[in-house]
């Protein structure tokens, strides 16, 4: 693992067979499988008397917050793969499930979108 002192940011280099960003997304969705992650779930109550769930892997190192995409959840392939790596590193990971994305319908008509960050702000 690199420390902050010797960390260097490098440019992303696409694989030769996935030059198009759309093909990268499609490939991941079809060919990559999710990992099995043992989460601990916490429910956070929001100021508007609704809720969202956060699935957690406990560790001792840095904390990573993972945000799923549209109609995703903490069980999305990219999230479970990330959380598996976080777990192996001994870090803590918080996978937020935006409203109505944890398998339970919420109490209010409010749903999430990328422009609404109040739930993420509450988690942080």
Model-derived regions: residue spans:
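N-terminal presequences and immediately downstream first alpha-helices
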Residues: 1-32
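N-terminal cap/lid segment of alpha/beta-hydrolase-fold proteins
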Residues: 21-58
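Hydrophobic/aromatic beta-strand patches that form the interior of the parallel beta-sheet core
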Residues: 42, 65, 94-96
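Short beta-strand element of the alpha/beta-hydrolase
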Residues: 61-69
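Active-site-proximal cofactor/substrate-binding loop regions of enzyme domains
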Residues: 64, 93, 118, 122
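Short strand->helix junction
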Residues: 71-73
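Conserved alpha/beta-hydrolase
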Residues: 75, 83-107
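Catalytic nucleophile-loop/oxyanion-hole region of alpha/beta-hydrolase
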Residues: 99-124
């Amino acid at each position: 693992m690199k420390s902050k002192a010797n960390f260097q940011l490098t440019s992303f280099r696409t694989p030769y067979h996935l030059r198009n960003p759309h093909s990268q997304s499609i490939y991941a969705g079809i060919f990559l499988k999710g990992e099995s992650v043992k989460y601990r779930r916490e429910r956070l109550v929001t100021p508007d008397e609704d809720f969202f769930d956060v699935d957690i892997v406990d560790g001792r190192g840095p904390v990573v917050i993972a945000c799923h995409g549209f109609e995703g959840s903490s069980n999305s392939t990219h999230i479970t793969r990330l959380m598996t790596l976080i777990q192996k590193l001994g870090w803590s990971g918080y996978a937020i499930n935006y409203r109505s994305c944890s398998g339970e319908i919420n109490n209010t008509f409010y749903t999430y979108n990328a422009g609404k960050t109040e739930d993420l702000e509450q988690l942080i």
